[in-house]
Every structure is written in structure tokens, then in C-alpha cells.
Amino acid sequence: TLSLHDALPIYPGQKRDYDSDYGGFTCCNGTGMENHVKYQAAAYAKTDDTLYVNLYMPTTVTWDEMGVSVKQETNFPSEHSKLTVNGSGDFTMKLRVPYWATAGFEVKVNGETICTNPEVSTYVEIDRAWSDGDVVEITMPYTLHLDKTPDKVDGSTVASLMYGPLVMVAKDDRETYVPMNWYTVVLSENLEDSVEVVTGPDAEDGSVPHLVTNGLHFYPMYDAYNYRYHAYVKVEETQSVVNKDQLQSLVDSAADALQENYGEDKIGRAHV
């Protein structure tokens, strides 16, 4: 039998436990099992002459009308996926470009690059006469972004730190919202400049992704177990974020103006 549980906890400093070692989930026992069937149903779609690849997961789809099958190989949370065509036929393959794949998305067919950096939330279209053994390789580097809630908490913006498709949670015992102030970390408009990627999604030793910023260590939500975590953090936005290159240009201009009046030996040039 399966025991019931209230929900997956996301309050500050919560800890996820399983109902039992082998007979329960962290929450949603019914829909938890249903998820996997839904993934299968949503992974691919087709029309008379087009195959849509919607999800990047280890699967094999058989297209009886076209007389082909496509095997997809990937190792979540890897940034890479490979599709191998079995059989031959003239059809279009459309590959989904995730909304978070904002840099470095690349598609190769039989080792030849056919597309780089397409528009996000669209499909890359490959229309060709496919042969048995054709290989499509997809690379989609994970990018960092904040997923903000519609409302604020005590006047502060609340958000989840996302790494590609992964919700990253901060490992921290505090039971109040932990703050992150990007301005105090680095004068930049890019999260990549203020978040250190300790372990990426393709770690050779199989380690899960690991990010560090503001002294906080972030791990994927799916791996958070038996410790207190924060799925949402307060993002301090009280000061304007300034582009580092723009700020350096302003400092250099001011230093040049001062040197004209006071001389090179009197002025020290600042660096940001």
C-alpha cells in the first residue's frame, strides 16, 4: 500500500522526506506516477510528414506510416542528446528549442553543423531524405536565469534560481527567506558573472550540478533530500545594476579628464 503525504515542501528551510523507503513518494502519490506516462505522451508528435521532438529523454519512437523509428539517447541532466534514425524516408524533423537555451544551442546531422543559436521557444526544422543510420546531435548549454514570483514578500522580489531546466535550491538551515544581492557580488547585468558553476550538468564523475553565489550552495531540487533547503530566495534589487564594462569606461573617461589638469603622476587609475 501507498501512504499519503501533504505536499512537496517549498517553504524556507523545509526538508523533503519520503513516506517510506519503498512504498511512497514525497507527495502526490497518484500524480507522481502519472507524470511518467505524461512524459511519454508528450515526448513526440507527428503530422503526415513531420516528426516533432518535444522532450529530450531516452526514448524510441516508432513511426509506422513512415516506416522508420528514431532512438534518442541522453543522460539527464546532460546538455547533449543524440537521435539515430532507423529506416529511410522523406520527412521533416522538428527539434524543440527550450526557452532557457539562450546561448550555444547547436544541431549537427552526421557530424555537420546545420544550426546554431536559433530563436528560443521555436523548433529547428530539418527537412531531408533520411537514410538508415543518420545521426542528429543536439547540444544545449545550460544558462542561468531567475524565475520570479508574481508577488513580493515584505517588499522584496522572490525568485527561484534556474540552471537550464533545473530548479536549484539553496542548502541552508535558516527558516526565513535567505537574501541574495547581485549588486554586492559583481557590477554586472549577467548572472553568469555572479554565480560560480562548481559542477556542470555533464560531470564525468556523475555529480549533480552545483552552483555557488552569495555564500550559498545550490543543488537541483530533484536531488534535495534529508537536508533543509530554500526553493525561493529574496533577490535584493534596491540598487541599480550597472554593466561592468560601461562603468569602467566612465571611470577611464574621468581619469583622462583629471590627468589633463593634474598630470599622470598625480592620478591613480581605478579598475572595476
Regions inferred by a protein language model and the residue ranges of each:
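Surface-exposed beta-strand/loop patches in extracellular or lumenal glycoproteins
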Residues: 84, 89-99
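Solvent-exposed beta-strand/loop surfaces of large extracellular or lumenal domains
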Residues: 102-127, 146-152
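Mature, Sec-exported extracytoplasmic domains of Gram-positive
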Residues: 95, 239-269
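C-terminal beta-rich recognition modules with glycine/proline-rich loops and embedded aromatic residues
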Residues: 7-84, 119, 128, 139-249
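Extracellular interaction modules
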Residues: 1-6, 130-135
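Conserved small/polar residues in nucleotide/adenosyl-binding loops
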Residues: 2-10, 270-272
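Hydrophobic, well-ordered secondary-structure elements that form the walls
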Residues: 95, 136-138
